[in-house]
Amino acid sequence: MSLFNVFRKEIEWGGRKLVLETGRIARQADGAVMASLGDTTVLCTAVGAKTKSKFDFFPLTVNYQEKTFAAGKIPGGFFKREGRPSEKETLVSRLIDRPIRPLFVHGYKNETQLVCTVLCHDLENNPDIVAIVGASAALTLSGLPFLGPIGAARVGLIDGAFVLNPTRDQMADSVLDLVVAGTREGVLMVESEAHELSEQQMLDAVMFGHEGYQPVIDAIIALAEQCAREPRAIEPPAPEAEAVAAKVREVGEAGLRDAYKEADKMVRHDKVDAVRDAVTAAFAGDDAALALAGAAFKDLEKDIVRGSILDTGLRIDGRDTKTVRPIEIYPGILPRAHGSALFTRGETQALVTTTLGTGQDEQIIDALEGEYRENFMLHYNFPPYSVGEAGRMGSPGRREIGHGKLAWRAIHPMMPAKDAFPYTVRVVSEITESNGSSSMATVCGTSLALMDAGVPLKNAVAGIAMGLIKEDERFAVLSDILGDEDHLGDMDFKVAGTANGITSLQMDIKITSITKEIMNVALNQAKDGRIHILGEMTKALGNARSDVSDFAPRITTIKVPPQKVREVIGSGGKVIREITEVTGTKIDIEDDGTIKIASADAEATQRAVDWIKGIVAEPEIGVVYTGKVVKIMDFGAFVNFLGTRDGLVHISELSQDRVKKVGDVVNVGDQVKVKCVGFDDRGKIKLSMKQVDQVTGADLSTQAPAEE
């Protein structure tokens, strides 16, 4: 008799086999599913604590991890084991979290953890989609109060046609990389990068993905019908909850309504805090009621703000639903930075800098798919002072990594090709003030800072964050949302792009799903806002600077025959090290013979260019060269010239006068001018000093004899 009671569901999905299996591995987890697409396999587990946590929020943790053995590799580094999460692992963890979090039953606060481990990667099917599907299945089987399942799919656009779950090779030809996840009824999450696609194309792609993942939802339901655990009993609301909510409304409603008429964020928050203190004081001595009052206070805030917007069409700061906050822009604000811009929109501000480097500055990324280099980096920082708080400063958190990647996706399609602009580019966005949509301020500031640095973007890029308030059939889509509107609303919908189309779309829904109609309204309203912001950006800086900063390295590219690369590098890198040390330049050499020389000093660059050209040049008969005596023999002197080449100046070619001893004319280390006069039968170079004026370098053999 087998130890395992295995249940398995297998479907054909997008031309490949999707397999969901449970009962064999991780049987002590509440839910465990081995999900496979092709030969890419991810183990997804879900565990929920049996008791309610002490937190007033839902403590859900999602950990996505890639094991190097999945691709037949051993980790690098001294310890030879996996360490802290990579950027991709962090991003995929967020990708799984976002569509799952809103589907847990309201009020469920038990600590819950999802772990998705990549066990096998066929280097064809991306494991992120497999992980989302597996996580959804594990939760559906677990008995936890999860209102799923959800499905997920990747959508590509190749030769004008949408492709469901394109392979890695197919993605190289796609102008769209879109991940969509949601329920049978609607979409919960979108993450994408696009090459200036229209609003209609993006909407069609989302709906194509929504339709594409329906078979996955059916498969998970079919599996759950066979083996799902009994649903956990949910703790009912406390009997006194209604009475507490009524008292919170009685004490706090008037003060909150007054507070949310205040346009200034800091003043508004002070007023809200004062009302919260009054509510807390009203429950002094009743710890049980006080524990319920916090949630009731948040519900009251939501009712007031949301109701006001739906009833009046006016928002917290007095704007209507479509107006963008005032914008002020200062390009080139930091004189020594290679490029910079200060972008301020209302109470949200980003100080963005661009730094230009060489190929040696590229980021080397060791992924399961193999090592590759990235020459465009964008880093987003959110210090606590940006929201008027004192807090921990340290390495970037998941949110900072996610916001930076969103801005990177928005800008990346507009970056120039590497052969047209051979720099490594690093952008840093410091959020110095924040009241909503700081990631979109980063997009705008990045576009401006890149143009200020002389980076020839194909088109300027702007971004805008949209929000949603929905009650039954009534809804309002909000342009350029505030932080409070994001917190109290139902949707975070970020759109970035150019005047020609969308380059990035990110959507997160806090309710069970939204309709195609709402997405269509949001996309078109976002376009109007984006065009307005681009107009403001154009007023400040219409085009990229014609040249890079005086403080940035100048990169000169030359081409040498591939077979000459070894000569330029030299034995053990000796030659190239000498060139860089003597000239003070940075030099990158590629196998195809492309050499990039970088320096802020034009003269240093030219010296390095001349040096390299000298190394790869072939000696020509009749041409005069400058060289150095490297060895003396009885029959002549060996002179090094053209980098690594040596030639012999025979004793008879040292001087017009008769020479008895070579050392009478030259010594080792002397700089001399020599003329190539031919090659011997073994191909060795024959040189002459007597045919060259050692002062001027003139070729004496071409001058007419003096008249007597």
UniProtKB/Swiss-Prot annotation:
Cofactor or coenzyme needed: Mg(2+)
Reactions catalysed, as given in the entry: RNA(n+1) + phosphate = RNA(n) + a ribonucleoside 5'-diphosphate
EC code: 2.7.7.8
Binding site for Mg(2+): 486, 492
S1 motif domain sequence ranges: 622-690
GO CC list: cytosol
Highest rank taxon of the organism: Bacteria
Cellular compartment(s): Cytoplasm
GO molecular function: 3'-5'-RNA exonuclease activity; magnesium ion binding; polyribonucleotide nucleotidyltransferase activity; RNA binding
Annotated keywords: Cytoplasm, Magnesium, Metal-binding, Nucleotidyltransferase, RNA-binding, Transferase
Major site of localization recorded for this protein: cytoplasm
Keyword Cell wall biogenesis/degradation among UniProt keywords: no
Keyword Cytoplasm in annotation: yes
Gene3D superfamilies, per database record: GHMP Kinase, N-terminal domain (3.30.230.70), K Homology domain, type 1 (3.30.1370.10), Nucleic acid-binding proteins (2.40.50.140)
Residue ranges of domain KH in the record: 553-612
Pfam family, one: S1
GO biological process, one term: mRNA catabolic process
Protein family per UniProt: Belongs to the polyribonucleotide nucleotidyltransferase family.
Entry function: Involved in mRNA degradation. Catalyzes the phosphorolysis of single-stranded polyribonucleotides processively in the 3'- to 5'-direction.
PANTHER family (UniProt xref): POLYRIBONUCLEOTIDE NUCLEOTIDYLTRANSFERASE (PTHR11252), POLYRIBONUCLEOTIDE NUCLEOTIDYLTRANSFERASE 1, MITOCHONDRIAL (PTHR11252:SF0)
Name recorded for this polypeptide: Polyribonucleotide nucleotidyltransferase
Gene behind this protein: pnp
